Amino acid sequence: DRLRTGILIGADIIAVLIPILCVSRFQLILAAALAVITYLMMDIHIDPLQMIISAAVLFVGLLAAYIILTIARSHDVEYLNGIFEMKNSRTPIFVTQPYMYIANNYDNFDCMVRAMASGYSHSFGLKMLFPLWALTGLKFLVPSLTAFPLFTTKEELTTVTLFYDAYYDFGILGVVLLGCVLGLLAWYLTDMVKHIRNPIGYLLYAQIAVYFGLSFFTTWFSNPTTWFYLAVTGAAAVYGEWRQ
């Protein structure tokens, strides 16, 4: 029992240290969100007072880590607020950054839609298939597969929304089709979670939940990292079910 507890504590410490050592605020938030959702989905009885205290401690800890990582990334607050065109250049970055990422990402989507309307050609599936080109190395052998301009309002702000690549590929039809596929995925996961018997299954559910919840942040399902995470988690979930 002590060995098992020690291994679990060590794994938790490593999981927290990885995003900190990578100086990645998003990875830190993602790790915390996955842990919280997985824990809540496991239907473990939690005292309300204990839950409130834990949530407060987690929030304060994440906020402190976010600020520290922002400083570690050498992000000057006034410089970033200048890019965001904030009226008050001294507004705390942890207040302006999340809001401006959301607002600017939809501005980037609008910028791309206007570019398509002005005569740029759609990519007809090549953008959404970027994980295939990246994970197989084809993007290096055939550079034309990924040679598409990124339409953004500012050179420094390159994050986009979930539907960016879908519209880039097929316009409104691409957005509708992706929405239908994601809707079916949500229905399947909602049904699947009723029959899950191991924590890894809940972790897989939590990953999709985070991707849906942060749909304004990036094109999750045309990102190679997303599919790598899903493949590893899915394999672990299948192995866990097999062991049981």
What spans do the regions from the language model cover?
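General N-terminal targeting signals
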Residues: 45-46, 149, 230
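Charged, low-complexity, helix-prone segments enriched in Lys/Glu/Asp/Gln
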Residues: 1, 85, 101-108, 189-193, ...
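Membrane-interface helix-loop junctions at the exits of transmembrane helices
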Residues: 19-25, 132-136, 216-217
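Hydrophobic alpha-helical segments
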Residues: 155-244
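Short, amphipathic, aromatic/basic-enriched membrane-interface segments that mark the entry/exit
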Residues: 1-4, 22-23, 148-149, 195-201
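Small-residue-enriched transmembrane helix-hairpin modules in multi-pass membrane proteins
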Residues: 62-182
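Hydrophobic residues in alpha-helical segments
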Residues: 1, 41, 113-116, 167, ...
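Hydrophobic alpha-helical segments of polytopic membrane proteins
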Residues: 2-89
